[in-house]
Regions:
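N-terminal acidic leader/helix
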Residues: 1-32
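Short, charge-rich amphipathic interface segments used for partner binding and complex assembly
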Residues: 25-65
Length: 65
Protein backbone atom coordinates (compact mmCIF):
# COMPACT_ATOMS: atom_id res chain seq x y z
CA UNK A 1 0.00 0.00 0.00
CA UNK A 2 1.39 3.36 -1.06
CA UNK A 3 -1.18 5.64 0.63
CA UNK A 4 -2.77 4.61 3.93
CA UNK A 5 -6.34 5.16 2.80
CA UNK A 6 -7.67 2.38 5.07
CA UNK A 7 -6.74 4.34 8.20
CA UNK A 8 -8.38 7.46 6.76
CA UNK A 9 -11.51 5.45 5.94
CA UNK A 10 -11.66 4.04 9.47
CA UNK A 11 -11.13 7.49 10.98
CA UNK A 12 -13.95 8.84 8.80
CA UNK A 13 -16.29 5.98 9.73
CA UNK A 14 -16.62 4.57 6.23
CA UNK A 15 -17.88 0.98 6.46
CA UNK A 16 -15.90 -1.77 4.78
CA UNK A 17 -18.52 -2.56 2.16
CA UNK A 18 -18.62 1.04 0.95
CA UNK A 19 -14.83 1.28 0.96
CA UNK A 20 -14.77 -1.88 -1.14
CA UNK A 21 -17.20 -0.31 -3.63
CA UNK A 22 -15.13 2.87 -3.82
CA UNK A 23 -11.87 0.99 -4.33
CA UNK A 24 -13.40 -1.23 -7.03
CA UNK A 25 -14.70 1.80 -8.93
CA UNK A 26 -11.40 3.67 -8.72
CA UNK A 27 -9.27 0.63 -9.55
CA UNK A 28 -11.40 0.11 -12.67
CA UNK A 29 -10.39 3.63 -13.75
CA UNK A 30 -6.69 3.00 -13.03
CA UNK A 31 -6.19 -0.74 -13.55
CA UNK A 32 -2.47 -0.46 -14.26
CA UNK A 33 -1.48 2.31 -11.86
CA UNK A 34 -1.70 1.38 -8.19
CA UNK A 35 -0.36 4.73 -7.01
CA UNK A 36 -2.98 6.73 -8.93
CA UNK A 37 -5.76 4.43 -7.75
CA UNK A 38 -4.76 4.77 -4.10
CA UNK A 39 -4.30 8.52 -4.44
CA UNK A 40 -7.82 8.94 -5.85
CA UNK A 41 -9.27 6.65 -3.17
CA UNK A 42 -7.58 8.73 -0.47
CA UNK A 43 -8.71 12.02 -2.02
CA UNK A 44 -12.32 10.82 -2.07
CA UNK A 45 -12.10 9.75 1.57
CA UNK A 46 -10.57 13.07 2.60
CA UNK A 47 -13.35 14.93 0.77
CA UNK A 48 -15.88 12.99 2.85
CA UNK A 49 -13.93 13.59 6.06
CA UNK A 50 -13.74 17.34 5.40
CA UNK A 51 -17.44 17.56 4.55
CA UNK A 52 -16.83 18.59 0.95
CA UNK A 53 -18.79 15.57 -0.33
CA UNK A 54 -20.82 12.65 0.95
CA UNK A 55 -19.68 9.13 0.22
CA UNK A 56 -23.06 8.32 -1.32
CA UNK A 57 -22.71 11.27 -3.70
CA UNK A 58 -19.22 10.13 -4.69
CA UNK A 59 -20.35 6.56 -5.29
CA UNK A 60 -23.40 7.75 -7.23
CA UNK A 61 -21.30 10.04 -9.46
CA UNK A 62 -18.72 7.35 -10.12
CA UNK A 63 -21.33 4.77 -11.09
CA UNK A 64 -23.28 7.24 -13.24
CA UNK A 65 -20.16 8.76 -14.81
Amino acid sequence: MIFDYKTAAARTGIPGDKLDRLTAIVRAEFPDDEMMAELHILRAILAVEQGAASLEDILRQEVAG
